[in-house]
Amino acid sequence: MLYMLTGSMAANLYAMPRMTRDLDLVVAVSAKNLELFPALFPEEHYYLSLEAALVAVQDFSCFNLIHLATMIKIDIMVRKPEAYRVHEFSRRQLHKINDHPIWVVSKEDLILSKLEWARHSLSERQLGDVRNLLSTECDFEYLNTWAKHLHLTDILTRVTA
C-alpha cells in the first residue's frame, strides 16, 4: 500500500516540533486494497470500521484507525485523483524514524496543504505551522507556482508578509 505521512507529525520532521494528538496519512488505496487492512491492522490492536473506509475510498475522503493500546488516532485520507494530489504524492520523501523508513510529504507540499486547510478552516494553528515551516529553507519557486495554481497566493502572501 502506498502512503505518506502528512500533517503536524510530518511538520515536526522539518521544523520546530509541536505537540500533536494524532497521525495523518494519505494513502493511495482502492476498494480492493481494503481487503489488506484487517491483516495490516488486526482488530486486537486497532479499531477500524471497514464500512467507513469503503465510503472514504468511494468519496476520496477520510476514515480513522485507533491504536487501542495507546488510543492514538490515525486519520487516513484517501488520495484524491486531482493532478496536484498525484504530483504531491510523487514527490514524497523517504525519511528514517527510529531506523524505520517512512514516506513523508515534501515540506513544500505540506505547506500548500496546510494553507488549504487554513483557508477552509480559518485555523490559526495551521498558519502557525506554515510560518514555522517557512522559517526553514524552502523552494519558494515551487511554492509560488503551485500556490497560484491552487488559488492560495493570497494566503501565502499574507503568511510570508
What does each model-identified segment do?
Residues 1-161:
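Compositionally biased terminal segments of proteins
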